[in-house]
């Protein structure tokens, strides 16, 4: 029954396939089965990604916040029953205390999405079962290096201009860029708690519905997908990711205080 409900929530073409301020995978490929066992789908009014960092904890983007969530683990295809598939509800969510959903700029006086501190922890209702298709991934212990080869993944749109959910988990290989490259596009909205990643020639990018998913650079989880330009994958418009090394103390504190 819940797969039928999920099918309704994620109906092809629905605008709510991604939340406001979302990041959106284009130019990628179908991930090898069970190659991203820490990847989860976070289902509320929208579709987001997430990362299993502990059997009881998922990290995702703060702008994926909702009053109710379902977390799908061990899935390659969102719409098919699979042997490693698990489902968990969320006991409690913890947005980063310094996250501000919208800001007003002096130039336009229009609210825009602020990607600073765009992280949220989800405490699962019961621990995930660790299997061949469901595994945790460690938090980073070292700064990522500019120029690193990175992999982003998600079930977000594969079309730069349309919000159409991908049935199969998609992967895309991109590079970690200097923050200056994102500053050229997003101006003062880029800070040292963010990572900039993509391809300057365009054609490869995260897209609608990928928010909250992992950015893995040289085999290490370094970022969480936050946001980017619309349409996705345009030249000279890399995407922004939350820089996890800046938040490990907060993550560990929340997990310790909420056993």
From Swiss-Prot:
Glycans are attached at residues 106, 189. GO terms for molecular function: metal ion binding; serine-type endopeptidase activity; serine-type peptidase activity. The keyword Hydrolase applies. GO terms for biological process: regulation of systemic arterial blood pressure; zymogen activation. GO terms for cellular component: extracellular space; secretory granule. It catalyses: Preferential cleavage of Arg-|-Xaa bonds in small molecule substrates. Highly selective action to release kallidin (lysyl-bradykinin) from kininogen involves hydrolysis of Met-|-Xaa or Leu-|-Xaa. Found in submaxillary gland. Monomer. Belongs to the peptidase S1 family. Kallikrein subfamily. This is Tonin.
């Amino acid at each position: 029954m819940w797969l039928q409900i999920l099918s309704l929530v994620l109906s092809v073409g629905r605008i709510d396939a991604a939340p406001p301020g979302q990041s959106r995978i284009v130019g990628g490929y179908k991930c090898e089965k069970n190659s991203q066992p820490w990847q989860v789908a976070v289902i509320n009014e929208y579709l987001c990604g997430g990362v299993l960092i502990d059997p009881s904890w998922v990290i995702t983007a703060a702008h994926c916040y909702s009053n109710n969530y379902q977390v799908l683990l061990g899935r390659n295809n969102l719409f098919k029953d699979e042997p490693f598939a698990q489902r968990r509800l969320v006991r409690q969510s913890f947005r980063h205390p310094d996250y501000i959903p919208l800001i007003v700029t002096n130039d336009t006086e229009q609210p825009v999405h602020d990607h600073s501190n765009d992280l949220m922890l989800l405490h699962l209702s019961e621990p995930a079962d660790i299997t061949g298709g469901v595994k945790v991934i460690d938090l980073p212990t070292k700064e990522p290096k500019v120029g690193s080869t990175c992999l982003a993944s998600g079930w977000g749109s594969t079309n730069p201009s349309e919000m159409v959910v991908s049935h199969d988990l998609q992967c895309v290989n991109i590079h970690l860029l200097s923050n200056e490259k994102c500053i050229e596009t997003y101006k003062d909205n880029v800070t040292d708690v963010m990572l900039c990643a993509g391809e300057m020639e365009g054609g490869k990018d995260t897209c609608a519905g990928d928010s909250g998913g992992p950015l893995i650079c040289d085999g290490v989880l370094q970022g969480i997908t936050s946001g980017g330009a619309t349409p996705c994958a345009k030249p000279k418009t890399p995407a922004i990711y939350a820089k996890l090394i800046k938040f490990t103390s907060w993550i560990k504190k929340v997990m310790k205080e909420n056993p």
